[in-house]
Swiss-Prot record:
Changing T241A: Nearly the same editing activity as the wild-type. Gene3D superfamilies: 1.10.730.20, HUPs, Valyl/Leucyl/Isoleucyl-tRNA synthetase, editing domain. A motif ('KMSKS' region) lies at residues 602-606. Belongs to the class-I aminoacyl-tRNA synthetase family. IleS type 1 subfamily. It catalyses: tRNA(Ile) + L-isoleucine + ATP = L-isoleucyl-tRNA(Ile) + AMP + diphosphate. Zn(2+) binds at C901, C904, C921, C924. It comes from Escherichia coli (strain K12). Changing E637Q: In strain: MRE-600; AA sequence. L-isoleucyl-5'-AMP binds at E561. Catalyzes the attachment of isoleucine to tRNA(Ile). As IleRS can inadvertently accommodate and process structurally similar amino acids such as valine, to avoid such errors it has two additional distinct tRNA(Ile)-dependent editing activities. One activity is designated as 'pretransfer' editing and involves the hydrolysis of activated Val-AMP. The other activity is designated 'posttransfer' editing and involves deacylation of mischarged Val-tRNA(Ile). Keywords: Acetylation, Aminoacyl-tRNA synthetase, Antibiotic resistance, ATP-binding, Cytoplasm, Ligase, Metal-binding, Nucleotide-binding, Protein biosynthesis, Zinc. Changing T242P: Abolishes editing activity against valine, with little change in aminoacylation activity. This is Isoleucine--tRNA ligase.
Length: 938
C-alpha cells in the first residue's frame, strides 16, 4: 500500500498549542522593554488625533490587589483599542505619594516627627518609603501587560508636580474661592487631623439614644402660644440625640416651621413634641396616660428660650429645614461646633460656634467640672448621669446606627469646629458652575451623572487644610493680628512654587519669611497647614496633564476609576478644575464596580476569599486575568474566584486554538504571491471573510462603547460558532487534500489570512501577550508589533445581490445543523461511525431545493458527508426526519456506498479506478497527479 501522507497539505506551525503564559509572558515583557515598545508606538502614532486617558493615581502604599488590576487592565484595553482606532493615545501612569497612610507607616518604623527625627528628616523618610512602594507596584502593573511611560510616571511628590499643586491653589485663591473659618469638619482624634469626605467610611456603632427635656424660661408665654391655662408642672421642649457628648456645645434647639407641635400633659410635667411623633415618643418613654393640651405651628415657637439642663445658660428655639419626622421628637439638639447642618443654621441665627473638644478628642479645661479632660466617647455615660441627676432625662436606651469612622483607623470620628481653610462651594458660584459642567460630561454608566450631581448639590464647603507633616504646604502668609492673607499672596505663592520646583516641599519649611517678605516678615506668619491629599490628585489635570509634552496641551478625554471615586477623585478634580478654569477636567468618566468573590461577598483577608493578581499571573498568566476583566460586565460588581478564572482559561483556549488552526493552515502561504483575488475565490471562503467583516463591525462598535464583555462574547461566537463549528470544519478536506498551489487551496488560505489579520488585532487590546505571539507567526511583511498598526482594512464580504449571499449561507448553516442531528442519532444507533460514512438525501420544498441544488456535488463538502442528494419534499419516505427549524426540509440517511479512500477518507465508487493509484479515489488522483480538483462554492 502506498503512503499518500506526504501528498497531503497537513497543518504545520511553530505556534505552540499550549499557552504556557506564566512562563512565556515575562520573556515577551523583557523584549517589549528592550525594544522600548511604548516609544515605538508613540513614534508610530505621532501626529494622529489624540485620545488622553488620564490615570487616577493609586496610593503609593502596599502591594497591588485585584481591584488595582481591574482598573489598570480596563485602562490598558481602552488605550490599546484607541491606538488601533487611529488615535495617538499616550498613557502616563501616576502615583499619589503624600498623606497620612505613608506618615503612619513611617511613624511605625521611626516614631512621630520630632521624636527621633526632625520634621525635615521625617519628610525625607516618607519620600523614601513612597518611592519604594511605587517601584513595587510598578513591577506588578507592568507584569499585567499594561503599556505606558513606566520610566517617566508622574508622582505627586515630584518637585515640579508639588510646585504645580501650589500654583493650582494660587489660581483658586485668585478666582476668589478660598475662605477661612472655624467650621465643623470630620476630625479623627487618632490622626489628630481633619478628614476629607472621601476618607470617611461608615460602620455600625452602638450609642446611647436619649430624650432630654429643656425647660421653658417663660412658662406663661408658652401657655399663651398654645392657648392653655391649666398645665400641671413645668413645660419643656424635648430633644432626642445619639451623641450625648455634644450637649455641652448645645446653643439652640431646631424645629421645623411648618410642622404641628403638640403640648402634651404627662405625669407632673408638660412636654412639647412634633404632633406626628407623640405616639412613638410616649411609647418609647413608657407613658400610657397622656393628654394633648393644644397644638401650634413650629414657626410660632421661634426664639422662645429654654434652659440648658446643666450648662447654666438658656438657648433659643430656631427654625431649620433639616428637621424631619423620621425619628426622634421633631426638635433637634443644635451644636454649631459639632455638625454641618448645625453650623449653617447657627450662622443664620448668629449663634456661637462653640468647640469644647481638643484635637485629641478630650474636653478642654473649663468645659464642665466632671467632663474636663475626658474622652468624648467615654463622656456619654457621664452626661447621661448628669441629665438624670438634673431630672432632665426622659429616656435612655442603647441603639445601633451607622456612624462615620476614619478610613485608616476604623475608629469613630467626630465633627469638630477648628480653624481651617475651605474652598467655598457658593461664594463665587462654584457649586452652580460644577453642576452645569457635569451635564456636559458623558458618564458611563449613565447613573454616574445623577450620583455626582446629588453629591455636588449637597456637599459642604471643601476643607482643604490638614495639620500633617508629609504633604504639600498651603504656602500662605497671614497677618499676625488680623489673620488676613498677605495682599501679594499670589506673587508670594509663585515665589514659593519656584523654590519647591528646585528643592521639593521642604523648601517651604526651610524658608525664612524675611527672604521673600523683607521688612514685612515681622507682621506675617507662615501657615503651617498642608493640603488635603485629594487636592494633590484632584489638581493633576493642571499639575500633570497641562504640562506633560506628550499631552500637547489637550485636556483629558477620559477618567476611569472605581465607583467610589464619584465622591473621591472625580469630585476633587471637578471642583479644582471648575474653580481654576471654569470647566470640567474630563469629557468622559467611566466607573467600574468592586471585585467580589464567586458568592458575591466583599473581598476580605479575614474571610480568606481574596484573589491575588500576582498568584493568578504566576499560575495562569496575565492574559487570563485580562480576559476575565474584559469578559465581566464592569458596570456592576465583578465576581472572581478560581472557578471563574478557570472558565476564562477555557475561553482563552478556544481563542488560542482558533488562532493556531489559522496559522497552521497558512503554512507555505506567501500573501505577496499566493493571494487569490476576491472575485476568483471559492464562495464559501468569501462568506467566511464576510463573517469576519461583520464580526469586526460589531467588535469595533463594542470597543468604541467600552463594552468589552460584548467584544469577548462576539469574539467567542466568531471563533466557536461561525468558524469552529462550521467553516473550519468544512475547509479541512479542501485544505489538506487539494493540490498545494491550486486555487481551491489558495482561496481558502487567502480567507484564513484575512481572518487571522483581523483576529490578531481584535485580540490585541485584551489578550496582548497572545496577540503579540500570534503576530510573530503570521506570514507576510509587517511591522514588528501589532500595537503600532490599526484595525485590519482588507476584509470584504458577499453582496446581497448575489444568489449565494449571506442569507443563503445562513440557511445552509441551519441545514447543516439538521443533518448533524440525524448523523448524531445514526451514530448513537451504531448505523454509522463518522459523518463521512453517511450519505444523506435532503427532501426539500422548491425554494430550498433550488438553493441546495445550486451547490451541485459540493453540497456534500458543506455537510461533511460522502454523499448528498436533493429530492422533492413530497417524495420523502416515512422514516425521513422532519426538520424542526426548516419546515420545508426532511432528512434521510443511509450508509455511503463505495470504498473509503485512505487519502481523503471519503467513501466513493471510484476508489482504485486508476491503475497507477489503485488505492485512492478519482478526486485524490486528480489532486496528486493531475490538474487538481476545481471548487466554486465550498
Amino acid at each position: 500500500m502506498s503512503d499518500y501522507k506526504s501528498t497531503l497539505n497537513l497543518p504545520e506551525t511553530g505556534f505552540p498549542m499550549r499557552g504556557d503564559l506564566a512562563k512565556r509572558e515575562p520573556g515577551m515583557l523583557a523584549r517589549w522593554t528592550d525594544d522600548d515598545l511604548y516609544g515605538i508606538i508613540r513614534a508610530a502614532k505621532k501626529g494622529k488625533k489624540t485620545f488622553i486617558l488620564h490615570d487616577g493615581p493609586p496610593y503609593a502604599n502596599g502591594s497591588i490587589h485585584i481591584g488595582h488590576s481591574v482598573n489598570k487592565i480596563l485602562k490598558d484595553i481602552i488605550v490599546k483599542s484607541k491606538g488601533l482606532s487611529g488615535y495617538d493615545s499616550p498613557y502616563v501612569p501616576g502615583w499619589d505619594c503624600h498623606g497620612l497612610p505613608i506618615e503612619l507607616k513611617v511613624e511605625q518604623e521611626y516614631g512621630k516627627p520630632g521624636e527621633k527625627f526632625t520634621a525635615a528628616e521625617f519628610r525625607a523618610k516618607c519620600r523614601e518609603y513612597a518611592a519604594t512602594q511605587v517601584d513595587g507596584q510598578r513591577k506588578d502593573f507592568i507584569r499585567l501587560g499594561v503599556l505606558g511611560d513606566w520610566s517617566h510616571p508622574y508622582l505627586t511628590m515630584d518637585f515640579k508636580t508639588e510646585a504645580n499643586i501650589i500654583r493650582a491653589l494660587g489660581k483658586i485663591i485668585g478666582n476668589g474661592h478660598l475662605h477661612k473659618g472655624a467650621k465643623p469638619v470630620h476630625w479623627c482624634v487618632d490622626c489628630r487631623s481633619a478628614l476629607a469626605e472621601a476618607e470617611v467610611e461608615y460602620y455600625d456603632k452602638t450609642s446611647p439614644s436619649i430624650d432630654v427635656a429643656f425647660q421653658a424660661v417663660d412658662q406663661d408665654a408658652l401657655k399663651a402660644k398654645f392657648a392653655v391655662s391649666n398645665v400641671n408642672g413645668p413645660i419643656s421642649l424635648v430633644i432626642w440625640t445619639t451623641t450625648p457628648w455634644t450637649l455641652p456645645a448645645n446653643r439652640a434647639i431646631s424645629i421645623a416651621p411648618d410642622f404641628d407641635y403638640a403640648l402634651v400633659q404627662i405625669d407632673g410635667q408638660a412636654v412639647i413634641l412634633a404632633k406626628d411623633l407623640v405616639e412613638s415618643v410616649m411609647q418609647r418613654i413608657g407613658v400610657t396616660d397622656y393628654t394633648i393640651l393644644g397644638t401650634v405651628k413650629g414657626a410660632e415657637l421661634e426664639l422662645l428660650r429654654f434652659t440648658h439642663p446643666f450648662m447654666g445658660f438658656d438657648v433659643p428655639a430656631i427654625l431649620g429645614d433639616h428637621v424631619t419626622l423620621d425619628a426622634g421628637t421633631g426638635a433637634v439638639h443644635t451644636a454649631p461646633g459639632h455638625g454641618p447642618d448645625d453650623y449653617v443654621i447657627g450662622q443664620k441665627y448668629g449663634l456661637e460656634t462653640a468647640n469644647p473638644v481638643g484635637p485629641d478628642g478630650t474636653y478642654l479645661p473649663g468645659t464642665y467640672p466632671t467632663l474636663d479632660g475626658v474622652n468624648v466617647f467615654k463622656a456619654n455615660d457621664i452626661v447621661v448621669a448628669l441629665l438624670q441627676e438634673k431630672g432632665a432625662l426622659l429616656h435612655v436606651e442603647k441603639m445601633q446606627h451607622s456612624y462615620p469612622c476614619c478610613w485608616r483607623h476604623k475608629t469613630p470620628i467626630i465633627f469638630r469646629a477648628t480653624p481651617q481653610w475651605f474652598v467655598s462651594m457658593d461664594q463665587k458660584g462654584l457649586r452652580a458652575q460644577s453642576l452645569k459642567e457635569i451635564k456636559g460630561v458623558q458618564w458611563i454608566p449613565d447613573w454616574g451623572q445623577a450620583r455626582i450631581e446629588s453629591m455636588v448639590a449637597n456637599r459642604p464647603d471643601w476643607c482643604i487644610s490638614r495639620q500633617r507633616t508629609w504633604g504639600v504646604p498651603m504656602s500662605l502668609f497671614v497677618h499676625k493680628d488680623t489673620e488676613e492673607l498677605h495682599p501679594r499672596t499670589l506673587e508670594l505663592m509663585e515665589e514659593v512654587a519656584k523654590r519647591v520646583e528646585v528643592d521639593g516641599i521642604q523648601a517651604w519649611w526651610d524658608l525664612d519669611a524675611k527672604e521673600i517678605l523683607g521688612d514685612e516678615a515681622d507682621q506675617y506668619v507662615k501657615v503651617p497647614d498642608t493640603l488635603d491629599v485629594w487636592f494633590d490628585s484632584g489638581s493633576t489635570h493642571s499639575s500633570v496633564v497641562d504640562v506633560r509634552p506628550e499631552f500637547a496641551g489637550h485636556a483629558a478625554d477620559m477618567y476611569l476609576e472605581g465607583s467610589d471615586q464619584h465622591r473621591g477623585w472625580f469630585m476633587s478634580s471637578l471642583m479644582i478644575s471648575t474653580a481654576m478654569k471654569g470647566k470640567a477636567p474630563y469629557r468622559q468618566v467611566l466607573t467600574h464596580g468592586f471585585t467580589v468573590d464567586g458568592q458575591g461577598r466583599k473581598m476580605s483577608k479575614s474571610i480568606g476569599n481574596t484573589v491575588s493578581p500576582q498568584d493568578v499571573m504566576n499560575k495562569l498568566g496575565a492574559d487570563i486575568l485580562r480576559l476575565w476583566v474584559a469578559s465581566t460586565d464592569y458596570t456592576g460588581e465583578m465576581a472572581v474566584s478560581d472557578e471563574i478564572l478557570k472558565r476564562a482559561a477555557d475561553s482563552y483556549r478556544r481563542i488560542r486554538n482558533t488562532a493556531r488552526f489559522l496559522l497552521a493552515n497558512l503554512n507555505g502561504f506567501d500573501p505577496a504571491k499566493d493571494m487569490v483575488k476576491p472575485e476568483e475565490m471559492v464562495v464559501l471562503d468569501r462568506w467566511a471573510v464576510g463573517c469576519a467583516k461583520a464580526a469586526q463591525e460589531d467588535i469595533l462598535k463594542a470597543y468604541e462603547a467600552y463594552d468589552f464583555h460584548e467584544v469577548v462574547q462576539r469574539l467567542m461566537r466568531f471563533c466557536s460558532v461561525e468558524m469552529g463549528s462550521f467553516y473550519l470544519d468544512i475547509i479541512k478536506d479542501r485544505q489538506y487534500t487539494a493540490k498545494a498551489d491550486s486555487v481551491a487551496r489558495r482561496s481558502c488560505q487567502t480567507a484564513l489570512y484575512h481572518i487571522a489579520e483581523a483576529l490578531v488585532r481584535w485580540m490585541a487590546p485584551i489578550l496582548s501577550f497572545t496577540a503579540d505571539e500570534v503576530w510573530g507567526y503570521l506570514p507576510g511583511e509587517r511591522e514588528k508589533y501589532v500595537f503600532t498598526g490599526e484595525w485590519y482594512e482588507g476584509l470584504f464580504g458577499l453582496a446581497d445581490s448575489e444568489a449565494m449571499n449571506d442569507a443563503f449561507w445562513d440557511e445552509l448553516l441551519k441545514v447543516r445543523g439538521e443533518v448533524n442531528k440525524v448523523i448524531e442519532q445514526a451514530r448513537a444507533d451504531k448505523k454509522v461511525g463518522g459523518s463521512l460514512e453517511a450519505a444523506v438525501t435532503l427532501y426539500a420544498e422548491p425554494e430550498l431545493s433550488a438553493k441546495l441544488t445550486a451547490l451541485g456535488d459540493e453540497l456534500r463538502f458543506v455537510l461533511l458527508t460522502s454523499g448528498a442528494t436533493v429530492a422533492d419534499y413530497n417524495d420523502a419516505p416515512a422514516d425521513a426526519q422532519q426538520s424542526e427549524v426548516l419546515k420545508g426540509l426532511k432528512v434521510a440517511l443511509s450508509k455511503a456506498e463505495g470504498e473509503k479512500c485512505p487519502r481523503c477518507w471519503h467513501y466513493t465508487q471510484d476508489v482504485g479506478k486508476v491503475a497507477e493509484h489503485a488505492e485512492i479515489c478519482g478526486r485524490c488522483v486528480s489532486n496528486v497527479a493531475g490538474d487538481g480538483e476545481k471548487r466554486k462554492f465550498a
